[in-house]
């Protein structure tokens, strides 16, 4: 496996939530630096040694609603 992709969203109570797209890996943290560390740790725990991805891609998704009138 070469890469694993996480979808990252803002948590309603603050901080961030991350979910892997093709694996059952979920984690959260209070800030971006903490999230990066939490995602890396979750990936290392999820896969057997030598079986995990070489890279982790964090795809941050933000939604904003704008009023037209």
Which ranges hold each PLM region?
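Short, charged, surface-exposed hinge/linker loops at domain edges
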Residues: 1-5, 33, 37-69
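Short acidic, gly/pro-rich beta-turn/loop elements at beta-sheet edges
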Residues: 16-18, 28, 37, 66
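A short, exposed loop/beta-hairpin motif centered on an aromatic-Gly-Thr core
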Residues: 23-33
